[in-house]
Amino acid sequence: GFESITGTKDACKLDQELTSTGGVIEAVAGNPNAIGYASLSAVEGKDTVKAVTVGGVACTEATVLDGSYAIQRPFVLVTKTGETLSPAAQAFFDYATSSTASQLIKAAGAVPVAK
């Protein structure tokens, strides 16, 4: 996690646990000593918070996709092991990983999923 990547395990103090991206952005914007987790799309274009550069690598779509930005987590689609997807679920998975969906996801400011 964050603490192991940054080497700050013993220095971090959990002060507040938030359950929404908007709450994290608001809390970090209001506290100059705060650090929070948020999706890149939630941070881009904001003048109140910024993504942290890690090891000289800025957080961009390109560095997320190529894996060079160290503090990231994938968004994954999951199903129950051993179960065959229903036609509707398979259609959703096919669409979510299609080039059409990728374009929509990019337009929304997020990094598209891969198959």
Where does each model-flagged region fall?
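Exported/periplasmic ABC-transporter solute-binding proteins
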Residues: 1-115
